[in-house]
Curated annotation (Swiss-Prot):
Taxonomic superkingdom: Eukaryota
Acidic residues composition-biased segments: 20-33
Record-listed Phosphoserine modification sites: S381, S389, S396, S558, S569
Name of the protein in question: Myb protein
Region of interest (Disordered), residue spans: 1-78, 348-382, 429-448
Gene name, Swiss-Prot/TrEMBL: Myb
Length: 657
């Protein structure tokens, strides 16, 4: 009874079972990419029991009948989906192994221990997955020869019968081995472009139904086609498919938007606006600046009484315009604010004398309405320019604008009014944070003048000096420079009365003590006259200091003594912070050494003899050195080290002598 049920179950369930565990267990090294075609179509492959298996369909039919002839209700009759779609757990596998070890393959006793499984499910789980006698390794040459021989005898469909002659193999393994590797009708050559095209077109129609695709390619198995698609073709054709889908979605969205605008009455409003412009006959502006600075030309209307016939003809021509003419009037794409450059404001030109006052009033009223009209809350963003004409037509300014349709979107945008007479906002040319132009800056005051003005402010008890006129400022500065010049001349006269021996140190000390501050010396460069021109120097024979003279290049007729005084010695130079010779302490130390030390030009002959190496011992050592060098230069190099040692010893003896 048990053996009969086993044969029937194996015969019925052979093509239906497709668990992943089985597939991984008996797959060969060369079959690593092999998968069963049924595993793709069944989502419950891991359970080992597909929904379309014959025996499970039989159980459904029995469940629909209700009861058996014996009158007892079966499990499948009460629960038509009993145990389906539920994977086997590890605990169930362990329990099944223990029960088989205890009771053997007696499924009538083992089956009731699994409340959520049918007896046939338990039997198939053991026979196809858990049986330790199953061979799940690679196929041998003997097994392949046996499969080929059995297929010739029984045909390529009796896989359960063929599996009985192969110990450890089941019918599914034999079937996959034959169809994927052993069948002589299988093509194992490289894939051609024609086959790739057939697979691509079939995949577009059928999807992943590899068995149906294999029927269109004789000599190729479904498994080989699937592996070729996943490994090679998907990367190549997915990019093309995405581009086709993207262009199709754009075309679909543009068509939908066009239909929406047509239904909302945009075209009818466009024609009404054109008719209204023809009847009103106002004057249009010759050129108007739009958002991007592009000029749009319009018709200039003159006297209505004289040109009524021409306007009528023009209006009739506008009524018969095609869409291609309307595309030329499309509003250009607005430049983002962050990319706009500051433009200088161009004043509006006056209207010509021939324009009537009523026409001017109409234009101002239209511009005022455009400015006073507030932008509504977020409206839909303007569509981007597409390569075909519907989008250009929809962006025409004469059509119903998106703002008038009150379409809401997540991104708020500002309205772009393309009205005649619309004024452009004047942008600020300068800002407080911008650097002003050089021409706008006032004259800069030189540093010596600033210091002189600060000195005048000190004399005025800290009050700021404000001259009444430029001439008074010059007079005050000349007075300050004159006073400083007198003080310096007195200091120089006093310094000349010092003794000749201490002249250098005394001059530097007196100069550092009584010389004017550093900031006052800069003002002496402002003297515009030489000492000969000053009245207080006319009767005195005072020597002009070098720092009191002007630059010689400014006075080409300067006397020679002034130029001579300009190139003075170091001791007559003004105090310089960077020169150590002008410091008091340094000067005193130098003068002390100059006055106390006396240089003797006569050299002691004994000291010269020792210093120049002319003593007796030095000359003896020099002769020995010359002798050693002379002997060593004549000896050729050799590899006889003992000979060299003898020479060295002889030299040592010669040196010791």
């Amino acid at each position: 009874m048990a053996s009969a049920s086993t044969e029937n179950g194996e015969e019925l369930m052979n093509y239906g079972s497709n668990s992943d565990s089985e597939e991984s267990e008996y797959s060969e090294n060369e079959d690593t990419q092999v998968c069963d075609k049924d595993s793709q179509q069944n989502s419950n492959a891991d359970s080992g029991y597909p929904l379309d298996s014959p025996e499970l369909q039989d159980s459904k039919t029995t469940g629909q009948k209700g009861q058996n002839k014996s009158g007892k209700t079966s499990i499948g009759a009460v629960h038509p989906n009993y145990g389906f779609g539920k994977r086997w757990s590890k605990s169930e596998d362990v329990l099944l192994k223990q029960l088989v070890e205890t009771h053997g393959e007696n499924w009538e006793i083992i089956g009731p221990h699994f409340k959520d499984r049918l007896e046939q499910q338990v039997q198939q789980r053991w026979a196809k997955v858990l049986n330790p006698e199953l061979i799940k390794g690679p196929w041998t040459r003997d097994e392949d020869d046996m499969v080929i021989k059995l297929v010739r005898n029984f045909g390529p469909k009796k896989w359960t019968l063929i599996a009985r002659y192969l110990n450890g193999r089941i019918g599914k393994q034999c079937r996959e081995r034959w169809h994927n590797h052993l069948n002589p009708n299988i093509k194992k050559t490289a894939w051609t472009e024609k086959e790739d095209e057939i697979i691509y077109q079939a995949h577009l129609e059928l999807g992943n139904q590899w068995a149906k695709i294999a029927k269109r390619l004789p000599g190729r198995t479904d498994n080989a086609i699937k592996n070729h698609w996943n490994s090679t073709m998907r990367r190549k054709y997915d990019v093309e498919r995405r581009s086709v889908n993207a262009s199709g979605s754009d075309l679909k969205s543009s068509r939908t938007h066009l239909i929406t605008l047509i239904k909302s009455g945009g075209i009818s409003k466009c024609m009404n606006n054109m008719q209204h412009n023809k009847e009103s006959g106002g004057e249009a502006v010759n050129k108007s600046e739009n958002a991007d600075g592009a000029s749009v030309t319009a018709v200039k209307g003159g006297d209505l009484a004289q040109e009524s016939q021409d306007d009528h003809q023009k209006g009739s021509n506008l009524a018969h315009l095609s869409m291609q003419h309307l595309i030329k009037l499309t509003m250009p794409r607005q430049t983002p604010i962050i990319l706009k450059r500051t433009r200088k404001h161009i004043p509006e030109t006056h209207h010509q004398a021939g324009c009537s006052s009523s026409e001017t009033f109409n234009q101002e009223e239209a511009a005022g309405n455009a400015r006073s009209r507030p932008p509504s809350s977020p409206v839909i963003s303007p569509i981007k320019s597409l390569p075909f004409s519907p989008s250009h037509f929809l962006k025409s300014p004469c059509l119903t604008t998106f703002e008038d349709m009150d379409l809401r979107a997540s991104t708020p945008v500002t309205k772009v009014y393309n009205r005649v007479g619309m004024e452009i906002k004047k942008e600020m040319e300068t800002s407080s944070i911008e650097t002003p132009h050089k021409s706008q800056l006032g004259p800069r005051t030189p540093t010596p003048f600033k210091k002189a003005l600060a000195a005048i402010g000190k004399k005025r008890d800290g009050r700021r000096y404000e001259p009444s006129s430029p001439s008074s400022l010059v007079e005050d500065l000349a007075e300050i420079i004159h006073e400083e010049h007198l003080s310096n001349s007195l200091t120089a006269n006093n310094s000349k009365m010092m003794g000749a021996a201490d002249q250098n140190s005394t001059l530097s000390t007196e100069y550092n003590a009584q010389s004017p501050p550093h900031m006052k010396r800069a003002r002496k460069s402002l003297l515009s006259t030489w000492s000969s021109n000053h009245p207080y120097n006319a009767g005195s024979a005072k020597r002009i200091q070098p720092f009191e003279t002007e630059t010689p290049s400014k006075f080409l007729t300067s006397p020679g003594d002034i130029l001579k005084d300009t190139l003075c010695s170091e001791q007559d130079l003004p105090f310089d912070e960077g020169r150590k010779e002008n410091r008091p302490f340094h000067n005193r130390r130098i003068n002390k050494y100059r006055g106390g030390l006396t240089y003797d030009h006569v050299i002691d002959p004994k000291w010269a003899r020792v210093a120049c190496g002319k003593s007796r011992d030095q000359m003896f050592m020099e002769e020995q050195a010359y002798a050693c060098l002379k002997n060593l230069s004549c000896i050729s190099r050799s590899l006889n080290f003992e000979k060299q040692k003898c020479l060295v010893n002889s030299f040592d003896r010669f040196g010791s002598l």
